[in-house]
């Protein structure tokens, strides 16, 4: 374990888009009052993916969708909103998650099967999908990667980020 830890180094000015071929952006689209609330991470090529999901019987629509998305072992993008969890929203919640997936895929010109979706925030409220889809159109491939970290905050007061390099 000590040898492994000695091979890990912190990158001071790094972010989610530091690895070659990765891009990210975050924007304020109106799900929250003032803060950034929508973002994505995009890879130039499909990347390996794994997931750990809740075993709770009640699972948010994005969780249900992403369980199927990761079965092929690869994703190329993830789109995330904060301010609304899209949880306990029934069939319309799953429809909205699939809409986020499809609109993101079209914006990035990739297959929807390569897009994961995540939502965090208030439970039990329908996701304002028109606001979200309009916001996806505002996201940039070469946007501000630090904005992504801001866009996924819920009640946090600071961004939680670390970038490391291993040998």
Regions found by a protein language model. Name each.
Residues 45, 68, 83-85, 120-122:
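Short, ordered loop/turn segments at secondary-structure junctions
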Residues 25-31, 51-54, 66-70, 152-154, ...:
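A generic local secondary-structure boundary/capping motif
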Residues 41-74:
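Active-site-flanking structural segment that lines cofactor/substrate pockets
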Residues 41-42, 79-81, 118, 165:
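Short beta-strand segments
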Residues 1-54:
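N-terminal amphipathic/basic leader segments beginning at the initiator methionine
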Residues 98-99, 103-167:
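Glycine-rich, mobile lid/loop segments that gate access to catalytic sites or pores
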Residues 79-108:
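Alpha-helical support elements that line or immediately flank enzyme active sites
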Residues 72, 87-90, 160-161:
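Short glycine/serine/threonine-rich phosphate/pyrophosphate-binding segments
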